[in-house]
């Protein structure tokens, strides 16, 4: 009997602590969602340039009655996020069909959604509130970047209830339209393993753009970087950025790596300037930036391809002895590859 009141007192303290924690961690749905339409109005999202086929397919999927959820799958840096966020820009500019003209695009912040969910049921409560909020909106579109992260996110130890399982019913009924993005590796290894979730999405392959598409994309973004760095980019410098980044930065993909080269070149010239006059970016400046990024000497980057290819077999035989047949086969393969025959 002597321990009864004490136990009650301790339990009261625990309840009070729990309620205090709940009051601290309680947030509105807007804290977990980012309104991309508002960001587009404030010019905080770059306009979508090119990618006509991918945009058309995405709009077709969004206009379906059910399973109207496009999934953008492509390598890192090919522009998946730009295609998804660019939808908000297209809506604001009125460049979309009537059926999705009045829609609002929201980006889900999964980190904020999970942060602070200490007790079982906190996470589910938050996500249910977000889903309920979206259902009340006029034609909402939910964008989840790196969508493979929702599988297992927020699940308690030993539990199977995560973001993906809570979203499935709303996605199946078409109550919420969702745009997802992920890489080929994550799609095959994680996302596609969850068949119940993956069949609710329609896959759109986002491949690396070719040279002409890259020129169109970067030429469209050129005024933004010129204004930011107070420089002028010539077509020759943009062409050099695409060609040299494609040649020497093999671990990354266009257009991201070419845009990075353009951005860093503008930054370099902006730092080195002695006055406020606009600097004209030339091919040599692009070559200097590529050299710094890849650690390849500028002389190697600026060397003429024709001369180096012409003397390739001879130069290899000078340093490799007793392997003439292998050297000839290798040099022939390189020459064929360079002219686009293999």
Where are these regions (language model features)?
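AAA+ P-loop NTPase nucleotide-binding core of proteostasis motors
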Residues: 1-342
């Amino acid at each position: 009997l002597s321990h009864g009141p004490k136990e009650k007192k301790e339990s009261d303290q625990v309840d009070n602590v729990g309620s205090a924690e709940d009051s601290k961690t309680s947030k509105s749905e807007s804290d977990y969602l980012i309104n991309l339409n508002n960001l587009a109005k404030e010019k905080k999202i770059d306009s979508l340039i090119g990618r006509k086929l991918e945009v058309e397919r995405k709009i077709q999927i969004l206009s379906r009655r059910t399973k109207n959820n496009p999934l953008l799958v492509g390598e890192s840096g090919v522009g998946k996020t730009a295609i998804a966020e660019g939808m908000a820009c297209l809506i604001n500019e009125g460049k979309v069909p009537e059926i999705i003209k009045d829609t609002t695009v929201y980006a889900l912040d999964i980190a904020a959604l999970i942060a602070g969910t200490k007790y079982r049921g906190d996470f589910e409560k938050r996500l249910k509130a977000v889903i309920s909020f979206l259902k009340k909106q006029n034609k909402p579109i939910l964008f989840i970047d790196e969508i493979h992260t929702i599988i297992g996110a927020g699940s308690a130890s030993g539990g199977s209830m995560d973001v993906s399982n809570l979203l499935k019913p709303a996605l199946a009924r078409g109550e919420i339209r969702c745009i997802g993005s992920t890489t080929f590796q994550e799609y095959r290894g994680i996302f596609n393993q969850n068949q119940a979730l993956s069949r609710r999405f329609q896959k759109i392959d986002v491949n690396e753009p070719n040279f002409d598409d890259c020129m169109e994309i970067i030429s469209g973004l050129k005024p933004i970087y010129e204004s930011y760095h107070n420089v002028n980019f010539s077509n020759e410098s943009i062409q050099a950025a695409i060609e040299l980044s494609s040649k020497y930065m093999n671990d990354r993909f266009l257009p991201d790596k070419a845009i990075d080269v353009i951005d860093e070149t503008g930054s370099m010239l902006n730092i080195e300037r002695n006055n406020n006059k606009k600097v004209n970016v030339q091919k040599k400046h692009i070559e200097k930036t590529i050299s710094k990024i890849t650690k390849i000497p500028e002389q190697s980057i600026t060397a003429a391809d024709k001369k180096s290819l012409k003397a390739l077999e001879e130069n290899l035989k000078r340093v490799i002895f007793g392997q003439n047949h292998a050297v000839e086969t290798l040099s022939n393969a390189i020459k064929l590859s360079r002219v686009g025959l293999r």
